[in-house]
């Protein structure tokens, strides 16, 4: 291979077990930006809320939750809910059934108003899918349903599926296979249909997979006026009579079918898929209209007696009180009987010597008690808050655990005969409060990793985020209205907490503003102004309107946030609209603070033209890559080739100083393959001037999350473990030097990156051997002597070795040395290994 100024390679296997390189160590061949070693700190799977931020209470304001229908595949969707106007709202992703009623007759009418739009919402096209609305109204004798279906395929061909989580990829593949089998119109239609099991085409002579698909029993085309995006209410009526069903849309018959099986019981269920539907005036009557069989609110979306994150106990009564609350809309009422009655939440980790500190708002009559107890109702610690006042009042508590340890639950109890409303509960550990509000073990794990920048608050989270939700007093912050990534974010971790966290871990903040592309044009200027106000809140002096708000929140000095990204993964928006946003937002933001750096999203087919037209409006281009498991070795090679193309485009564009920010990267796995990929990826980036910033994802994840299992830091309510990608990244950063060195020679299957120690005393060689064979590496250099070597490496022996709570060091760091012969250094690089060799001159 020719002389390299910036060297890293994964080359096809040459069958050789030996390779030799010659390093030029007299002077650097280039400068590496340590901002490569950043992380995406997205509010996902409790990374911030109840993760980094040591709030131990979920749903602290006792608001009812939406009904998710099914266990989330990736935790990213909202659920069914009924609003104050008695309008039923559907989820907007995945099939989620909502049961309405069941009937012991085949003769009935179902009527309702329907408002449906078939276009994809923001962040909803990641996994593909069929765009339809269905109502299961009858059953076959075997119990399987008959559906009334309204289907509009217009947007199904406009799905874009980047490499995201494994479940998203699986869902996209399944949707594509089902679409190929499903018999359906190429245009919008109404149909009466049932499920059939069919087999997809196999590959390589293998049988295909069997899957349930919708088969139309009768169908009719739907006009644009009947199926539209204008949010118009339509009247739906389904008339069921024995073996026949007739469907009416806006009082006109649209489709009918005679030939339905007649079951003893029929289940009425709402379904939607990848669209948004709302319903009102839902009513089921007998065929002659004389009897009302169902009317009103489905049971699953009715307001519960107890907020969903809390568990009731005792012999009393409970109800959520609307319109009388400290925070948001609801408070929890507890009426005790003859025993202490209350609500609890767990699990909570009880640590010897720890003190549990918090507060609760209450009103009513009776005595209130808080505490921590085990599953057998044995108290670890408790505190009486005394008799509550008639009006809302804040009660603080501090409960030492003493020598107790174990797993418990937090308890709020009302003593016998009491009648108390509670709201806005919070609890932390004293240790966490002493550290600024952060969970101690997660904070330490982040510090040990040394992320050089933190991209926040997302990610896809940005699309729905409003930064003003997360500033001001904690007790005034409202939680999100919608479920996202398994959580209703409490907004306890906002801008001020994020900046404090960055300073605590010595990391540069990267703020991501939203252009909210799914919003109508008449909101554009306000959306832009919101982004500008956020910049002013962070960087303007206290004499500015928004700087004054920051000062009022306890932070008089500007934060001087340098890096600002214009939203996230904008391929759904399209290049024309997004390019306008980059120009408008970037120009306006630079007028407020000319020192900031603007980051624009790439990943468009038109990136080259985007750079040529608008390169002067931004400083960095943001790209994402999630590699599938099989690409742990080859992925970095392909990425290097891609980054080289961008380097050429930047060079030929109006702003040759643009650099790449690989703002999301990882392998979709949590075993040793992630370590090999991380080492190869970082070597690829260190070798190229064009890559200046990086942010791995996921950063922090709770272990019971249903998907995206590739996080660096993995935690539960009491402990954590780090994954191989964390371990390799930490090792690489601990040996970081900004001085890149060139070398010559064939590297074969090895990934090699060479740098000079910043004090000039040695040479650093970062190595990844992704093969199952050892490779002998011979290193020659222009140094006069070798005084010693150190080799730190991971070589667990198998791709599938993974750390866990039970075995945190399944992938363990090893130490070794190379063989020295004069000025020549020889190292045997173990199979499936990643390590750093230091050659001391």
Enumerate the predicted regions with their spans.
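Extra-cytoplasmic beta-strand recognition segments
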Residues: 58-67, 101-120, 232-234, 298-299, ...
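Extracellular beta-strand ligand-recognition surfaces/modules
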Residues: 20-21, 62, 133, 215, ...
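Extracellular glycan-recognition regions
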Residues: 72-304
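Extended acidic/polar, glycine-enriched regions
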Residues: 338-340, 345-444, 448
């Amino acid at each position: 291979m020719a002389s390299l100024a910036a060297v890293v390679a994964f080359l096809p296997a040459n069958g050789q077990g030996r390779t030799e390189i010659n390093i030029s160590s007299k002077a650097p061949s280039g400068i590496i930006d340590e901002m490569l070693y950043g992380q995406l700190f997205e509010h996902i799977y409790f990374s911030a809320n109840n993760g980094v931020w040591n709030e131990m209470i979920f749903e602290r304001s006792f608001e009812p939750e939406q009904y998710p229908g099914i266990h989330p595949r990736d935790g990213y969707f909202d659920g069914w809910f009924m609003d104050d106007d008695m309008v039923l709202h559907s989820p907007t992703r995945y099939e989620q059934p909502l049961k309405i009623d069941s009937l012991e007759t085949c003769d009935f009418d179902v009527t309702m108003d329907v408002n449906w739009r078939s276009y994809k919402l923001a962040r909803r096209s990641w996994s593909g899918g069929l765009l339809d609305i269905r109502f299961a109204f009858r059953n076959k004798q075997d119990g399987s349903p008959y559906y009334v279906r309204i289907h509009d395929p217009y947007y199904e061909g406009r799905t874009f599926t980047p490499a995201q989580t494994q479940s998203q990829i699986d869902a996209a593949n399944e949707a594509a296979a089902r679409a190929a089998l499903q018999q359906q119109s190429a245009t919008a239609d109404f149909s009466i249909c049932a499920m059939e099991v069919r087999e997809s085409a196999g590959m390589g002579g293998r049988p295909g997979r069997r899957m349930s698909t919708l088969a139309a029993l009768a169908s009719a085309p739907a006009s644009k006026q009947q199926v539209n995006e204008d949010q118009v209410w339509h009247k739906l009526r389904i008339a069921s009579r024995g073996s026949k069903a007739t469907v009416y849309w806006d009082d006109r018959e649209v489709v009918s079918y005679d030939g339905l099986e007649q079951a003893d019981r029929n289940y009425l269920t709402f379904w939607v898929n990848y669209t948004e539907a709302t319903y009102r005036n839902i009513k089921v009557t007998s065929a002659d209209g004389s009897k009302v069989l169902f009317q009103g609110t489905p049971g699953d979306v009715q307001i519960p007696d107890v907020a969903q994150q809390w568990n009731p106990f005792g012999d009393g009564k409970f109800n959520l009180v609307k319109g009388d609350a400290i925070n948001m809309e609801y408070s929890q009422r507890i009426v005790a009987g003859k025993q202490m009655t209350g609500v609890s939440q767990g699990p909570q980790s009880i640590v010897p010597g720890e003190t549990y500190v918090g507060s609760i708002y209450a009103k009513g009559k009776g005595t209130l008690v808080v505490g921590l107890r085990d599953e057998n109702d044995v108290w670890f610690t408790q505190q009486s808050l005394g008799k509550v006042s008639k009006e809302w009042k804040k009660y603080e508590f501090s409960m030492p655990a003493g020598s107790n340890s174990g797993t418990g639950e937090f308890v709020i109890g009302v003593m016998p005969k009491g009648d108390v409303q509670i709201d806005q509960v919070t609890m932390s550990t004293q240790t966490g409060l002493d550290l600024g509000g952060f969970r101690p073990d997660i904070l330490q794990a982040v510090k040990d990793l040394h992320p050089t920048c933190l991209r926040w608050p997302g990610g896809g989270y940005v699309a729905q985020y409003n930064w003003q939700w997360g500033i001001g007093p904690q007790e005034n912050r409202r939680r999100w209205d919608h479920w996202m990534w398994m959580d209703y974010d409490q907004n306890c971790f906002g801008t001020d907490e994020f900046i404090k966290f960055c300073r605590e871990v010595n990391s540069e903040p990267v703020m991501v503003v939203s252009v909210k592309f799914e919003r109508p044009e008449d909101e554009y200027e306000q959306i832009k102004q919101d982004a500008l106000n956020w910049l002013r809140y962070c960087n303007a002096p206290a004499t500015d309107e928004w700087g004054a708000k920051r000062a009022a929140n306890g932070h008089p000095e500007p934060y001087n946030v340098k890096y600002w990204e214009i939203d996230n993964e904008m391929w759904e928006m399209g290049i024309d609209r997004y390019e306008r946003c980059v120009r408008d937002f970037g120009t306006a933001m630079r007028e407020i603070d000319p020192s900031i750096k603007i980051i624009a999203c790439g990943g468009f087919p038109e990136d080259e033209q985007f750079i040529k037209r608008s390169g002067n409006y931004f400083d960095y281009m943001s790209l994402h890559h999630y590699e599938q498991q099989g690409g742990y070795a080859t992925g970095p090679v392909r990425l290097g080739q891609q980054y080289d193309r961008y380097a050429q485009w930047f060079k030929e564009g109006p702003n040759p100083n643009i650099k790449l920010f690989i703002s999301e990267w990882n392998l979709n796995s949590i075993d040793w393959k992630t370590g090999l990929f991380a080492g190869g990826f970082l070597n690829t980036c260190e070798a190229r001037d064009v890559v200046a910033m990086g942010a791995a994802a996921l950063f922090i994840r709770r272990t019971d999350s249903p998907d995206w299992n590739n996080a660096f830091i993995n935690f539960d309510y009491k402990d954590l473990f780090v994954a191989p990608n964390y371990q390799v990244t930490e090792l690489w950063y601990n040996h970081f030097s900004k001085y890149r060195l060139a070398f010559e020679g064939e590297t074969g299957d090895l990934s090699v990156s060479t740098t000079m120690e910043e004090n000039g005393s040695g040479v650093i060689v970062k190595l990844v051997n992704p093969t199952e064979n050892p490779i002998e590496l011979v290193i020659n250099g222009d140094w006069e002597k070798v005084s010693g070597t150190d080799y730190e490496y991971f070589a667990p022996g198998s791709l599938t070795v993974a750390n866990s709570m039970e075995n945190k060091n399944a992938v363990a760091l090893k130490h070794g040395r190379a063989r020295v012969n004069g000025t020549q250094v020889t190292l045997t690089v173990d199979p499936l290994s990643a390590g750093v060799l230091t050659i001391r001159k």
